[in-house]
Amino acid sequence: MFERKIFSQHYEGAVKPFKIIGNVYFVGCIPASSHLIDTGDGLILIDTGYEDTLFMLVDSVYRLGFQLSDIKYIIHTHWHSDHTAATMGLVALTGAKTFIGHKDAENAKTYFVPDEVLRTGDRICLGNTEIDILETPGHTKGCISLFFNTEANGKTYRVGMFGGAGVNTLTPGHYEYPDCVADYLNSLKQLRQENVDVFIGNHVWNNDTCKKGELLLRGEKNYFIDADIWHTFLNFCEQRVKNVNGI
């Protein structure tokens, strides 16, 4: 679990789109995740992926029975190309409003011009969904994490995403910015204060997205529902960044 694979190209392949739980869907590729939230008044998309996987995302939206025009908001967890490079094309197709953490806004202009910037305590509301924003710097200076509720089987589940778990920018000689490691460790402390029932990743390796999705599509148990895996993953992230930095 939590194995980070290194790919020789931007993407390894397509993933059949599927409903994770409630109004939350996976529409990403391997290795970069994208998620749709059906708010009842339009779709919220979390991360757009690579420019050369835009066709996969568009196909996934249609396969799930939605229209591109349903996408109203696009939220980006951070500015790196595997989460933002398809945004300009998707905005041209949808007219969606774009959001990113305020400290990543300038770098994001490499790929698109954000409409709104986000800070801790901000809440994005559309239809039946309210997404709470937490700044979690480290992987990038403006990385954000997201938390919201979804309903399924007569229950309310808290969904959470850590917006930047990767340590490629936290490795000696490759730091994203000064003090990024200290920021990352502090972000983990903040994230541990959140209770999460359904952990979604912004890369498929974060939470075994593909394996769990395949089981769901076969009608088996929903392994995305797990109140323990959030903290297990955060502990893994802490140990990994300490290992690569000799802490």
Feature-to-residue mapping (PLM):
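Active-site HxH/HxHxD metal-binding segment of metal-dependent hydrolases
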Residues: 24, 52-55, 61-125, 224-233
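Divalent metal-coordination and catalytic microenvironments
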Residues: 23, 37, 47, 57, ...
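Short Gly/Pro-enriched turn/cap motifs at secondary-structure boundaries
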Residues: 15-16, 25-27, 113-116, 135-139
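Structural recognition of the beta-strand scaffold that forms the well-ordered cores
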Residues: 26, 44-46, 72-76, 97-101, ...
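Short, flexible loop segments at the rims of nucleotide/cofactor-binding pockets, characterized by
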Residues: 22-26, 49, 74-77, 175-180
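Conserved beta-strand hairpin/beta-sheet module of binuclear metal-dependent hydrolase folds
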Residues: 10-64, 145-167
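Short, basic/low-complexity N-terminal boundary segments at the transition from targeting/disordered tails
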Residues: 1-16, 97
